[in-house]
Amino acid sequence: MPMINSLADHLDDIRAWRHDIHAHPELQYDVHRTAALVAEKLEAFGLDEVVTGIGRTGVVGVIRGRGQNSGKTIGLRSDMDALPIQEIRDLPHKSQTDGKMHACGHDGHTAMLLGAARHLAENRDFDGTVV
């Protein structure tokens, strides 16, 4: 199956993760709920390693491909924090925390990276390591 079809199969989950993260914004290094959600998902996807608590709330996942071990590694990253802004839009997934909002896209970036991690962990049709 082409990769785009595989990713499309997970679109509803990716959207739900984004909406959940958007509704529960956290600032700077105090992204404990978001970090726990990310770590839980990465572990459920079957990553080779999931390390938490980096720089207080950072999360790192490691996925090793099934190809010949070339020793190559690529890093994918996303910020998880929100901004100290009051959300005034009336959406079903509107911020539930006064004075905090995902106004810069980190909720979407985190959800998309979770989708990529899920796809890579399920397929592993690459050579090297993704961190």
Segments predicted by a language model, with ranges:
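Acidic/His- and Gly-rich active-site-bordering loop/insert found
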Residues: 1-102, 111-114, 118-127
